[in-house]
From Swiss-Prot:
PROSITE patterns: CH, KINESIN_MOTOR_2. ATP binds at residues 556-563. Pfam families: Kinesin. Keywords: ATP-binding, Coiled coil, Microtubule, Motor protein, Nucleotide-binding. The gene is KIN14D. It comes from the Eukaryota. This is Kinesin-like protein KIN-14D. InterPro entries: CH_dom (IPR001715), CH_dom_sf (IPR036872), Kinesin-like_fam (IPR027640), Kinesin_motor_dom (IPR001752), Kinesin_motor_dom_sf (IPR036961), P-loop_NTPase (IPR027417). Belongs to the TRAFAC class myosin-kinesin ATPase superfamily. Kinesin family. KIN-14 subfamily. Residues 1-20, 852-977 are annotated as: Disordered. Residues 1-13 have a biased composition (Low complexity). It comes from Oryza sativa subsp. japonica (Rice).
Amino acid sequence: MSSSNNAAAAAASPDPSRRREDVVGWLLALFPDLPLPPPPEATDEDLRAALATGRLLCALLRRLCPGALLDDASTDNVGRFRAAVERMGVAKFSASDLERGQMTAVVNCILALKDRFGSRGGDDHRNPGFLTRCDSEGGRKRVESKLQRMLTSPIMSGIPGVDKLTIATDFVMVFQLKQGGYADQLGGKYSDLLKSTSLDNAPTQSLLGVFNSILDESIERKNGQIPYRIACLLRKVILEIERRISTQAGHIRNQNNLIKAREEKYQSRIRVLEVLAGGVSGQTHEKEGMINLKTVKAEETQRIEDEESKKEDVARLLTDKENNDSIISELKKELEETKRLHEAHSQQLETKAAQVSKELEQRIEEVKLMLDDSTKRRIELEELSETRIQFWKKKEVVIDQFVSLQVQNVQDLKLSSVSVRHEILNCQNKWSEELAGLGKSLKVVTNTAEKYHGALAENRKLFNEIQELKGNIRVYCRIRPFRPGEDDKSSSVEYIGDNGELVLSNPTKQGKEGGKNFTFNKVFGPITTQDAVFKDIQPLIRSVLDGYNVCIFAYGQTGSGKTYTMMGPEKATEKEWGVNYRALNDLFNISHDRRDTITYELGVQMIEIYNEQIRDLLGSGGVQKKLGIQNTIQPNGLAVPDATMCPVTSTSHVIELMQTGHDNRAMSATALNERSSRSHSVVTIHVRGQDLKTGNTLRGALHLVDLAGSERVDRSAVTGDRLKEAQHINKSLAALGDVIFSLSQKNAHVPYRNSKLTQVLQTSLGGHAKTLMFVQVNPDVSSYTETLSTLKFAERVSGVELGVARSNKEGKEGKDVKELMDQLSLLKDTISKKDEEIDRLQLLNSSTRLKPTRQADSVLKHSSSSPGITSLGKGTSVGSGAASDLDNFSDTSDRQSEAGSMLSVDPEISGLADVDSDGRTRAVNRVQKLTLPKAGQSSSLRPKPRDPAPAATGVRKSSTSQATPLARNNSTLKRGP
């Protein structure tokens, strides 16, 4: 029954559970280890779980029909099984049926496979292509038609004693061999075909078909190789065909001889009949003659027909013989070619066999050697094991003796343990007493140590407070790491201590003379990170939000890493930020944390001092904008009021501004540094905070100064503009050194005006500010001279005392101070007007040739009786520029006219009040301290005239040059730089 009929019969079965049980039972019979319950207990879900992955289906098909599955990496196991089943013509199922649908289609498919392959039980090893072709209905019809034509052929009918059914059965197998491929058959098949009886009973046409099938199979293989058994079968078939042809030829000769003998016999009979017919008379003889004649004629007719049929058979046999001869010749040629290929292949196999035999002989020799070694090793191991056995036996005896001795010792120990226990108890009691005493002593020592550490911490705190009260400039030294290409083994820095110690070694001197010792607040080594440097100065920066002015500047020779410390490298990441970025970020974070108590406003200025000119780096004009300096000490530290003030609200905004300023800064390459700063950069962050509870105002300023590096012209090899820049840089740094020296010597006169750099830093170096200097050191031996000079300068800086830093707070008392300052500004404005009136009167008096002394005295008396002075507390509408007139300073104003103006204030300000640093009012008999400079100090509160006419200014200069008596008496007052 075909597979389609089986599937239809299975589908027509009325009991699906019975079909499922049949499938489960068959699967368990094929795969005993399958995790399925017994057939009566198995359900559709159990069967679906076992078949879901498709592995069981593929294993079943491999067992029933090996090679039917195709290796397709893009298809899963279920898809491969379904494709193979579809090629075989078996009822298939869809993937959805196996996943969540009914299992009926799956069961029908498996039952169809069982019906087709169940009788073989998985032992059918035919080629899958043959199964696909021969099991189909068309294939079977083609085979049956071929067999039918062969059985009904004249050749088969002419062979007596042949069982057609047996021949058909045998050559169905031969045809199957052709279709399925002879290489896949078992040895028994070939043995059956080689039997002489099988070939003897086969028709000649079938033998030729087998021969052609073998040749076709050889051609399909495309390698020209025929297995030995097939070659033997082929030779047997050819011999059988030759034998049959020779036998047919003998039969033909015998038939010809027999025909000739029969012809002679018939002719003799005819002659006898003729004689009898002529000699016999009478009716009886005639009747007998007629009967004999009819018989003879019938026999003659039959003979003629037999002869014709025999002639036809002979002609057909001759034709077949000719065809067979041609076929045999072709077969012989093909057989010769096959023999030649077979001989070549045999020769290759013999060569390969010889090589393999040689290799096997070598391997056998190696194995023999290994066997000999193993034998020797076995003998040695046996001897060694025997020796060890004897050794362990002796050791066993010794151990037995030792164990007996130990048992005796244990018994002795048990006896002595009692006495030892008593001794231990006594010792424990003694130890407890000693431990109690040690505990008391340890407690005393611990208390002493705690007091010592407390005293040490207190001493350190007191030392820091003393340094804070003195207002010393903090000095941090940072050692630059070696650059690629520099000799990192020859360093001028010999030792770096944990407490700020630094030892500089002179490469030209050895011993004690070659070392220089320095001590600073902190020394950072070459491997110190930017974050570690910032953490040490973080408390100082945070004091800006408490109202203090803080200045941090970097000093050192060119190429020592000043810009790296202050700004960081180009396109720096957050980890590589310098002090500037980290300080601003920290200020924003703290101001955000304090937003519930204090609101802060932050503004940023960024300038550079290039060739003794101040440039605004944040202005719309870029580096082309030149600015003036304000030398007066302001609470907010605003030294350059005309510079662009940019309010900032976030760190990203500050970074963008600072990057803009950094791009506008003058940079150039020298022989010592590829990115040498050719100007001094000053970044100022102004902080204004207002306490939400008290209403007090805090003002602080953070100055971040990146000084240009000092350089030796012979080493930097600069010319032209770079040489001019280097000269200005060295000049400004020399002026800074003079200021530091004057401050360290506590001189009355400090030369701030010698350089624009010292004028900008005046509020930080000469005011009540917290100042820190980074000293950048190049450890290269070739820069020893510059390094030594830098460290000596830093040592002088560390000895400068600036005084106690003051917080810029404006509370209720601060407002009084501000009002007083406004009144003082109004007074200055009034004095300026009086000076103009004096100039006008002097012009009138000069025209009438009056004496200058009397004119000045009358003017001074008139000024003292001016109603504007008596109503000083009420006159607040004099002008909005009064306060700025007090604070501003003009570098081009005439000093003598300023002296005359300030001296004229003395008799009119005796009734004012002054405020000290704590905001408390006191008697103001010393208000001239705000207007007149002390001896040896610079004047910081000199008024600027409110744009007088040029003619009046010239007159005032001439009149004051004549000097009133009071002016002549005070003309020897010292002025600041």
